Amino acid sequence: MVKLSIVLTPQFLSHDQGQLTKELQQHVKSVTCPCEYLRKVINTLADHHHRGTDFGGSPWLHVIIAFPTSYKVVITLWIVYLWVSLLKTIFWSRNGHDGSTDVQQRAWRSNRRRQEGLRSICMHTKKRVSSFRGNKIGLKDVITLRRHVETKVRAKIRKRKVTTKINHHDKINGKRKTARKQKMFQRAQELRRRAEDYHKCKIPPSARKALCNWVRMAAAEHRHSSGLPYWPYLTAETLKNRMGHQPPPPTQQHSITDNSLSLKTPPECLLTPLPPSADDNLKTPPECVLTPLPPSADDNLKTPPECVLTPLPPSADDNLKTPPECLLTPLPPSADDNLKTPPECLLTPLPPSALPSAPPSADDNLKTRAECLLHPLPPSADDNLKTPSERQLTPLPPSAPPSADDNIKTPAERLRGPLPPSADDNLKTPSERQLTPLPPSAPPSADDNIKTPAERLRGPLPPSADDNLKTPSERQLTPLPPSAPPSADDNIKTPAERLRGPLPPSADDNLKTPSERQLTALPPSADDNIKTPAERLRGPLPPSADDNLKTPSERQLTPLPPSAPPSADDNIKTPAFHPQRMISRHLPSVSSLPFHPQLHPQQMIISRYLLSVCGFRFHHQPMIISRHLPSVSSLPFHPQLHPQQMIISRHLPSVCGGRFHPERMIISRHLPSVSSLPFHPQLHPQQMIISRHLPSVCGGRFHPQQMIISRHLPSVSSLPFHPQLHPQQMIISRHLPSVCGGRFHPQRMIISRHLPSVSSLPFHPQLHPQQMIISRHLPSVCGGRFHPQQMIISRHLPSVSSLPFHPQLHPQQMIISRHLPSVCGGRFHPQRMIISRHLPSVSSLPFHPQLHPQQMIISRHLPSVCGERLRGPLPPSADDNLKTPSERQLTPLPPSAPPSADDNIKTPAERLRGPLPPSADDNLKTPSERQLTPLPPSAPPSADDNIKTPAERLRGPLPPSADDNLKTPSERQLTPLPPSAPPSADDNIKTPAERLRGPLPPSADDNLKTPPLATQEAEAEKPRKPKRQRAAEMEPPPEPKRRRVGDVEPSRKPKRRRAADVEPSSPEPKRRRVGDVEPSRKPKRRRAADVEPSSPEPKRRRVGDVEPSRKPKRRRAADVEPSLPEPKRRRLS
């Protein structure tokens, strides 16, 4: 064992790391040890020693390095380092010195000490001075702290003597022997880094650039003379504090680096500036210099920016001329100055600079910043920014003649105002020129598709003679000349629009009429398909005798006189768009599809005589009005979110819509009534195909929604969905003997078309998927449960289904008539649908106006249909079709005459806030308040009674009744139904509804075994599948139960007693034996969760029905759940 004692003096430790390494290597040359261990020791000493005082009076520091014979080093240097760190912290805090090893932390504490008024040593007098009062550390506090530290260190040293070896894989530099020591070391490092980050954040942004230049100069040029080491992470604030204190000349006791790092002199005591010296790097602290220093050629750091009250004279070799903080007067201009004038403190405008004799230099980047100038600067010829903000309101001089490759000469519109017109501008027509007609354009060319470019969002450009936008909005007030006869291949000649610029004009352009002409009616023409232009959004159109949309919303409550018979050549008398609406007149029923213009405008193409109609894909918002077609195709789009398309054909027996994104709608016009299929266009594209004469309809795969409606139904089922969360599918068939609905997630709807009235199936799309199967003549029908919606199905009413929903989230209302063979009420989100039967098949479909306000009018027997206006009503007319406005729906109607055969719905739509008052002849017998109480028993069921069960309560189901068709509420859906009649050929749905995860096993006598749930119970059904299977598999366990009760019980009882006597935990075997019975309890719990609310009802049915073997098995599993004491009583008996 070789021990080497190295004596390290403060002067020796004040050297840098290289010198320390060399001297230590010279001292240990005689010792034969590996160099790596010695290098670790030297690095430890160099990293952890403190330069400065003599460690509180201790002149010597002994470091013992022990080398064993196996060349493994045992170092006790960390104990010495702990002593040194604590003592230096104590005594340096008293002397005004910082005990941190990091320069950033020392600088930060130096600033803090200066604020607190700690004493420091003056640079000239070498005496301790105090600028102002502050907290001071006394000697008594230091002694007390020192004694405490010594006691603590002795305990640690005594503890460390036990462990004398260090693992060879541990690092010596900063490594601790235990996890606790390592954690303490890491915490200290983290605190040091936090102090550095906090200090860096204190630097103001205005001083960062100049101070960074000081760092570079001090580190690169003045490293040796100043004694500052080259540290790249040295920030500007630390260097600034060092530069503010000039170090004294080096002595034997104190080194240059020691004096420069100690920060002995505060800047308050310097009343006069020091004379400049050539070898002084830190010239003058910035706090107390009242007069500027004379310039020096070799001085890099001229003047700090705080207290210079007068500007310094310019110099050619000065990099940072003048900081911007304290200049009360502007500096004279300088040709070679990089930063001409800072913008902070200029109270007066700068004088105009003369034209430079020399060309501008590349280093003259920042001429004058414009933030702090109170007056504008004079113009200059060599200014890069030609037009300041004030010049934007004045017209520009005319530009050069246009070139062939110049598409758009005028840049983007200015937010303040339009640019002046120019001759060579492509976008020629500003908003002012739209009020006057344009001169006739050149003869059209064959390749001219679209003459009007996309609208500008901010404002129009000035007009020009050769503008591509030939027809402004004012030209719509005059009729267009007749176009050439249509050709076979001329369906829609307009390709996709350009988003940025217009297409060249042509004579055979399809877009003949822009949107501004819609405000007034066009003169009638023989070949004109559209007699009346679209409605104005702001105000109603003037009344006309031949107008189809005659009655505003106020006149709907009074019957209108019969209108004139339709004529053969009258196709569309009044197309109305609010913001988009199209109404066909010659169709026996009309689909009015207006949409919300802001969020999701939609497209509609209505063709009459075309045998094949194909909807093109459009992007942005064009409006194409084809005049060669006998009907009009209006195609407006929403450019931001998703364009939409609709194709409505009249004479096509079979229409197939191609792939549309995000929406497609194809409606075949052989249907006596129209199915309105609106969708939510934001998230997912939707597709719908409705066919009438196809005997077998198969829906392909649609994502996210699919809908196939077979048109053998005398009435139409409207199946709208909420497309946000989940895709949906619907298959509705009436006369098809085998129709199977594929897998649906999260909603499924199967409607059997034996009902002479329409089944309305609304869903709540946000929270839970829902499923509903409604059948009339099927002997076993199960009604689904809805949350948070409610469905009221009146039985004694002549088929009126009132479907109100949760008003907060999705306020919807639906009234469905029974005796209308061809009226379909669609369900919208969050919308309201009212289908009136008293009108000759007019369906008024208003919706929620905030999110997606839409309107649909479906007519059956009316040759002309009128759509409602959202903004304002149209003037009344004699032949108006719309009888009931939306305002009168909120008040109760007077009692009507006794019901007649053609009277479908006598009660207007329900109020969103509350129900209507009851009346004797009211079809909706049960208002929303009556839903919480059971209904009185009704008359015996009749053959024409469709749905006998009223709507479920939001909180719970209504009590059952004998004459109720929907026998099983949502809770009873999990129990088997009584055996139904043998299946017939006309039975539509033979397979029970699919479950969300997987279908239940089929049963021969069960039509709808397990209808799916729509609420939170749907999630509970997921584990029910394996549970039911396990219950079926565990059917043999009841036999061993019987054996245990009769045979093995006497033998098991003494076994239990012995286990209780021998084992300390006697209840444990008892629990285990109870757990033996648990396999039967588990299915009991599962089935009990399924039938919890309606446990007595399935018992009654099970007792009376006595179904096949499968059902009693299920009964046993279900009977044991609520009646656990019953098997116990049997065992006791």
Swiss-Prot record:
It is found in: Membrane. Keywords: Membrane, Transmembrane, Transmembrane helix. InterPro entries: NPB13-like_MII_rpt (IPR048893), NPIP (IPR009443), NPIP_N (IPR054697). Residues 252-262 have a biased composition (Polar residues). The keyword Transmembrane helix applies. The chain crosses the membrane at residues 60-84. Belongs to the NPIP family. This is Nuclear pore complex-interacting protein family member B5.
